[in-house]
């Protein structure tokens, strides 16, 4: 590989974006610079990596106690996303699961309860996203919400509560209400449940590897491997196009 010198971290971020735009690299990885620097270069006005889609962060997690891969989004970028932003966050994760071979991923839109409550905005957004998916505004997935975490990942919990849902107990994607909830959930799975994880930013023209400063070498390596897979799928035309 080639090492390219720059005068400062801002220049490093700008150079990474230039290389990606030119097709010389298939993904961009955050190094020791701050997340804001690399993401700012990606979404800057006139950046050739920016798309109409909102960028969002995904953790793809292998949780020992769960039967399949589990995606948690968004745990790192969108602090308090609006309904429209949640739609993009959801679609980014769905598109990723398509690239990983899941034809119709199941999305659980998380809240504290399973009923709509006008005093709990997360339940309103969850219900709206469910309808949006049914109307084709979110494509290629089964979406249901609001669902509490236990219902999303445990069919037994769903039966106990009397919740009938095609997503309950079998979620592929957990769409969290805000960054704080997502960050805490992902780190609980990492540290309490001994999950393996890969972390990517989606919604740009190339995948962006964005890991936490505390992430292990294993997480960094799996993130790079996932980015390589996503880049290869897009090059082969197997991923959904983002304009």
Regions found by a protein language model. Give the residues of each.
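Anion-binding alpha/beta catalytic cores of soluble intermediary-metabolism enzymes, centered on
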Residues: 1-167, 172-243
């Amino acid at each position: 590989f080639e090492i390219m010198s720059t005068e400062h971290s801002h220049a490093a971020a700008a150079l990474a974006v230039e290389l990606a735009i030119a097709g010389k690299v298939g993904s961009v990885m955050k190094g020791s610079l701050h997340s804001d620097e690399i993401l700012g270069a990606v979404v800057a006005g006139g950046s050739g990596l920016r798309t109409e889609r909102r960028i969002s962060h995904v953790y793809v997690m292998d949780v020992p106690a769960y039967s399949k891969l589990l995606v948690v989004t968004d745990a790192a970028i969108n602090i308090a996303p609006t309904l429209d932003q949640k739609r993009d966050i959801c679609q980014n994760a769905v598109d990723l699961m398509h690239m990983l071979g899941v034809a119709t991923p199941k999305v659980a839109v998380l809240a504290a309860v399973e009923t709509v409550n006008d005093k709990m905005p997360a339940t309103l957004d969850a219900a709206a996203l469910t309808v949006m998916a049914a109307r084709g505004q979110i494509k290629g997935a089964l979406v249901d919400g609001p669902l509490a975490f236990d219902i999303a990942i445990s069919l037994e919990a769903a039966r106990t509560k009397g919740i009938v849902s095609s997503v309950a107990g079998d979620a592929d994607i957990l769409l969290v209400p805000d960054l704080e909830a997502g960050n805490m959930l992902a780190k609980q799975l990492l540290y309490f449940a001994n999950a393996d994880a890969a972390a990517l930013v989606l919604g740009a023209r190339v995948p962006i590897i964005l890991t936490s400063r505390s992430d292990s070498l294993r997480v960094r390596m799996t993130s790079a491997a996932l980015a390589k897979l996503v880049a290869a799928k897009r090059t082969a035309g197997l991923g959904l196009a983002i304009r």
